[in-house]
Every structure is written in structure tokens, then in C-alpha cells.
Amino acid sequence: MIEDSQEDHNHLVSKLSDFSKQHKTLKVALVCDWLTVVGGAEQVLREIHQLFPKAPIYTSQYRPRKIDWFKGADVRTGWLNILPVFTRRFIAPLRQNYFKHLDLSAYDLVISVSGCDAKFVKTKQGTHFCYCHVPTQYYWGKTKEYQKDPGFGWLNIFVRPIYRLLLPKLRQKDLEAASRPDYYITISSYAKSEIEKYYKREAEVIFPPVNIEKFSEVAQYKDTIQGNCQIIQKHQNEKKQIEQKKYQETKNNKNQIDKKAYETIKIDKKQIKESLYHDINIESSQVENVENFAKVHDYFINFSRQVSWKRLDLAIKACILEKQKLVLIGDGPEHQKLIRLSEKHPDLITILPTLTQSEIKEYLKSAKAFIFPSEEPFGIAPVEALAAGCPVIAFNKGGAKDYILDEKNGVFFDHQSVNSLVAAIKKFNYLYYETENFEDGNNKKTVSQEHSSHSSLLSPLEISKTAEKFSTHHFKE
């Protein structure tokens, strides 16, 4: 049964306070599922390890060449480490057994960072805090997705029946593991509800650390860019209106357009162009003319691990339908499939391999929004995008609901479908450019028709501020 949440919260805060006062004299151990890739879980572990730098890290498999964050740390592995990394997805029962018999009862404080089996370790009563990302997804929340595509390529045909056969036993073992931690901490309101649903345990939400500072410097650049692009767009619209007026007046044998007004527009555009190149140090060779400047900064972006449940196929299909440019950055089992899906549209879809953080920041400078079509417990990448002043178009489920403010720092779409995402892209473009209608389902409408007062996106600097509560500083506090 789930205990009273306020009582649990107070007890957890009290215990954390007690441990924090004694941490210099405590014998502390850290545990994680594996250290073979760089991801959100590993980032959480890195921040916790900085708080307890002398604590050993227990894990099932470790590959320092794949993740170099823990060089010099006391990383301890067992017999599973002799197996190749690619076997990680095959050995769930072995990994459960490994952690089940890992005895850490000699430690005064054990912190497991787990979305899988690390929570199974043995500890003495009252010492085990589990920072649980979400109940093991391929046993619980995403069994349908894993059944459809277990992620083993041509071996899927053999894996599916084995998965169905083992699932009841794996679930039973996972529930046994879930009973071992004394206290649960988790990453989002969504993850909290999943832990309550499947494990019948109460969890305290502490948002995971995001390196906000590294990305927030992009927001200032984007603020200048977006402001100038919007000015350009405004003048383009004014020019179009004047040209339309000229056509109508000529057609009706009326006086020609007011040349003085037209010359004013041309002068303003020249001044804007000079201001752009002077203020943000952009070379004129980068764009043919001022009208094309906005087009350079006119693509959507996603950088993530490319796996089936991320639903990056939706982003590609929606952008092709809407004739919108999209840049996908990353690698994974779906990489080649995504390339094949987009190969007929090289003018719209660009797929790049995994890039460095500095390279990603350069792409964020020119992106108008991050597309986040997956249902995830949290989502580090979209928060990094927000920190860079880049709004997010997100599926209206999962951890995104903790940081997306609809029509302020992003736009939600309600169904994990191409049509729903297309409607969100149209809505976003309306808010971004403030120039066109959008369609939601079969109904064509405008934001002003939906709301009593006009709603528009925050500026890049304001968007960046909405990500500040997810900083590493806040996490450590």
C-alpha cells in the first residue's frame, strides 16, 4: 500500500538531512545498472559522485572508452563485465541475479541510480535510497513497444517468443527488487505516478541535473537572431501587402502605389541588413540577401539516441508533409531506418551522427524548435534545448509536462501520430511567425480565435529561464 505522501516526504527529508550532516564520516556506496553509454542516468550518477567522490561505484558492466566521466573513480564490476557490451540486452535474468546477490550491508548509505536492476542490492535497513528513473520499462510501461520491436534486428523473430515466455518471471523478480530500497526518489511527476502504479511505492520528485549553464549562452545569440528575423518577416509581409495593393490599384486603373512608402520599406530593410551584420558579426557571404537570412534559421531539430520508442519517424514524416526542414543528430539501432525513411527528401531532412556538445550548440543557434515526439520519464535533451532558448514541440505525456508551458516555451500535441504532430507544427509556426492559420484535426482556426487574448511564445532569453530549475546547482542543493 502507498503510505501517506506527506508523512513519507517529511521522513525522507529528515533522513536526507541526517545523512548530509554526517556524509564525511559515513561509509557510502553508489550503484547503477551499467556504465557503457552516455545518457541521463549516467549524468545523474556523475553529479551524485561529485558529492561523494570517495564512494565506490558498483555496476554490472563498465566501458571507460565509451564513457570517460569516471576515470579515477573506484568503479567495481563483477563477472558480468567479461561479457561483450552488446549482450547487455540479452542478459536481464543474469543481471537481476547479479544485483540480487550483491551485498552492500557494510555501508551506512547506499544510493542506487536505476531504471532497471541496480535497486536489487542487499543493504541494511534504513540505508538504501533509490533514485529510480521509472519502473523497468520493458517489464511494465512499454511492454507493447518492446514486444513490437525488441531492438535485436533480424533476431527479433526469435526474441519475441522468449520475451513473452520470460516476462511473468522477470516482473516477479522486478517487484522483489522494488521492495528492497527504503526510500524512492524519482525524476518527474510522470515517473512518480508510474512508481506508484507498478511498485506501489511513494517517491519524492527531485528533477535530474541538466548542464543548463553550457547551453544558456546560446540563448543570447538566439534572442538577437529571432528578434531580427521577426523584423525581417514583418517587413516582408508589409512589402507583400504593398505589392498586392499595387496590383489591385493597377488592375482597377487607379493611381500607382505610393512610391515614398515603398522606398521607406527598402531603406528600412537596408538598415536592418547592416545592423544584423554589424551587431551579430555575421558575414554577408552566409546569406544571399536579407530576405534569405530568416530562411537560414528555419529548421527543426532533435538530438537523441535513435531507438524505436523515441518515435523520430513521426518527426520525419510530419516535416516532409509540411515541407519543413529537420535536422536529426544521433545514432542507435534506428539510424539506418531513419536514413532510408528520409532519403527521398535530402532538401528537407538532414541526419547527422552523434556530435559533440559544442557542435550541437552550433546547430541549436539556428534551430527554431526542438521536436520531442516520445513519451519519456523526463528528457534531458529537450531541457538542454530550452536552456539554449529553443522552444520544444512535445508529445503531451510523460516528463515533458513538468517543463513545457504550452504556447509559452513550446507547444504540445495530444496524440502520438503524424497528423497530431503536423497540427502542432502549424500551430508553432503561427506563434513563431504570427502570420498564418493552423489546422487542428479538421478545423482550421487561429490562436486568437481559440483564446480571448493573443498568445505568443516567450523570447529565447525568457525560454532559457524556464530551464533554470533543472540546473546541476539546484540538483545538488
Predicted features by range, described:
Residues D406-E407, V411-N419, I425-Y433:
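Conserved acidic donor-binding segment of nucleotide-sugar-dependent glycosyltransferases
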Residues L51-K119:
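Active-site donor-binding segments of glycosyltransferases and PAPS-dependent sulfotransferases
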Residues V290, Q336-S358:
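Nucleotide-activated donor-binding/catalytic signature segment of Leloir-type glycosyltransferases, i.e.
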Residues A92-N97, Q416, D440, K444-V447, ...:
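A charged, aromatic-enriched C-terminal amphipathic alpha-helix characteristic of glycosyltransferases
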Residues G151-Y184:
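Membrane-proximal helix-turn-helix segments that form the acceptor-binding/catalytic region
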Residues P391-F395:
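Short hydrophobic beta-strand element within catalytic cores of glycosyltransferases
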Residues K365-P377, C390:
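Acidic donor-binding loop of glycosyltransferase active sites
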Residues I225-Q230, N292-K310, I316-K323, V327:
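Conserved donor-binding/catalytic core segment of Leloir-type glycosyltransferases
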